[in-house]
Amino acid sequence: MLKCVHFALGENTMGTFRMYTSDDGQSHFEDIDLSNTPDWTSAQATTGITFREIPVGNFQSWHPAPRRQYVIILSGQLEIGFGDGSKRVFGPGDARLVEDVTGQGHTTGVYGDQPCVTVTIPLANQ
């Protein structure tokens, strides 16, 4: 069963995740606990910000990330596939540090019947 983490007004939770390439060349994810990850809560140098609306039905086959970047979902949902065959659905408020810049990468597709709006924040010196 796919797990979907939601962020809604009035709730004090949001999903924070890291996507990375392990020694086997496959992409994986891990949940990030902000209280134990000070580098996530301190200022970081970035190179810009991009807002994107991804249409319903959009699917990208295996690809590594073009650079280390944060991707935050503002609305809609994305389903990300990983090298071990698992899939995870990310929704509004979920923030991902995408670091799987080598290896097979991951798949990305819009999940559900609404477009997905994301904000991408590339990290500097990556």
Residue spans for each PLM region:
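A short, N-terminal "cap"/entry segment at the start of jelly-roll beta-barrel domains
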Residues: L2-E53
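Short beta-strand segments in beta-sandwich/barrel cores
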Residues: P38, F59-Q60, Q77-G81, A95, ...
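Conserved short histidine dyad/triad with adjacent acidic residue
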Residues: L34-T37, G48-A65, D100-G103
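Short acidic-glycine-tyrosine-enriched beta hairpin
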Residues: D84-E99
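Short, conserved beta-strand element in jelly-roll/cupin
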Residues: A65-I80
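A short hydrophobic beta-strand segment most commonly corresponding to one strand
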Residues: L97-V101, T107, Y111-Q126
